[in-house]
């Protein structure tokens, strides 16, 4: 019984224990659920309190994400465009002239000229011109602009003549200078070498009569090369017909306007057929005002090509220097550069005017430095011949007068005021009868710093700084052409040294520092830099006395005589001997243009050689022990042995020493006879 009671008491204990646990668990779970509900209710309450702030944040996040996505898309698009551009440039670099769609005969002529691949200007401009579009191209000098407009013009004429062989003037090429006209005409002849029967060209810049030009134009040449003034003169007279003109080209377009051809260009534009002339304009520098003027004259809707950024690799081969020096130091530095051969190779020296060019030439002659002068007073045939011979390596130094650089003055308003004041003064002088004598006639269509293709020029020296940064660009563009290396050296007169040396001072040098500042700013935009030209001034001073001796000998009278003498010689050569040299071309090589002009000038033999004591130590070591140097008073040949030989043999007029013979000298004492 006791056991049962124990069991009975045990059983309910076993049963009742989990019930109490369940109750405690339920109570704990209920408490937890209540706490969670409270926490949830607490967390929900602030969201319900600020729904607007969260929406704004969400909108901002979505907008930022969209902006980031758009930026990524734009960057990817730009990268794709760059990759496509690089790929297209690679593909374009592999193009040949036959791939451009030119006539096969022109491609054959191009191959004969040793042109391997088209340049960037040619790759971009030729397809546009062949498609009939107006092209306005801005590219650096020496980039092949001439072929870029000549080849599509010739190709279009050949294509037209295949179906319509009617002869008429199809193309008119306008250039600012006679020298450039001759160069373009020669390029046309070279490119049309295999189609001479189909293409006829003419140049209107020669000094011939109107009757000769009329007979030349009567055959209706396909291509005419001329300056605007000559072209309008022949159009106005009826000798040149432009009624069916298809192509118009302006080479060095900005210079055409700067040379004062505005009125001629406007007249030519009026005479052209409306809406049917394809226009191409080429230049290395084009200002917006000039663009607007030219567009108003000729272009409908031109395609702009600005290719200046593509030539950075070639620009690295052009090294630019400047040296700040006094006006007399210019002559000393020039003497040292050429006499000591600090710069080797063909050089172009630019000066401000013609008198200065001849003064520098006569100065160089004192030191036996040969050079030739290129200026507007020389006949056109002589100027062309000098350029050709320089390109063939006959001359090493050309001194070019760049009077035309004045037309690039950037402050046009002040320039117009000066011209108006000058016109008023001239009018007053004419009224009073006090006008000065008219200066020598100069060719208004002369220009050497623009467009002329000087070949293999090692250095360009700005003996006198140009008047504008634009003119500077075209001067230095004569060197470092077609991927070759070159040097540009500019001599700048500081404002505090201006006018200190009056015999060599000119007014143009007063603004040298301002022009240099403009040039440096312009070159900085093109990622180029002008560096100072460093040299040892102490060593330079040792040569100053020689420079002063030579400079004193070059007087104004000597300069005037040299100018008149060369003009007389060149006129005789150009007119009288022109036919003779055409019949005897081998004798043309004997006609040189770098001969001495200062025949009546005081000659100083000691200046023609540099003594070794003036040279630095390296120069002295270069002389060997056997080289004794220059002996100025040593006589050539043994005069003592030759003197009197004619007399000894009885020659007529000899100076024998008391020898017998018809021509010998007689001893007066031995032949003396006393009269009886």
From Swiss-Prot:
Q: Which UniProt keywords apply?
A: ATP-binding, Helicase, Hydrolase, Nucleotide-binding, Nucleus, Ribosome biogenesis, RNA-binding, rRNA processing
Write down the chemical reaction(s) this protein catalyses: ATP + H2O = ADP + phosphate + H(+)
| RNA-binding is among the record's keywords | yes
Motif DEAD box, residue numbers = 251-254
Q: Where is the composition biased (Basic and acidic residues)?
A: 70-90, 410-432
Which ranges does the record mark as transmembrane?
none
Where is the sequence biased in composition, kind Basic residues? 642-663
Give start and end of each Helicase C-terminal domain: 317-541
Give the residues annotated as coiled coil. Answer: none
Region listing for Disordered, in residue ranges: 1-97, 410-444, 633-676
Q: What is its EC number?
A: 3.6.4.13
According to its record, what is known about the domains? The Q motif is unique to and characteristic of the DEAD box family of RNA helicases and controls ATP binding and hydrolysis.
What does this gene product do? ATP-binding RNA helicase involved in the biogenesis of 60S ribosomal subunits and is required for the normal formation of 25S and 5.8S rRNAs.
Give the similarity note: Belongs to the DEAD box helicase family. DDX56/DBP9 subfamily.
Q: What is this protein called?
A: ATP-dependent RNA helicase dbp-9
Q: Which organism is it from?
A: Neurospora crassa (strain ATCC 24698 / 74-OR23-1A / CBS 708.71 / DSM 1257 / FGSC 987)
Q: Which gene encodes it?
A: dbp-9
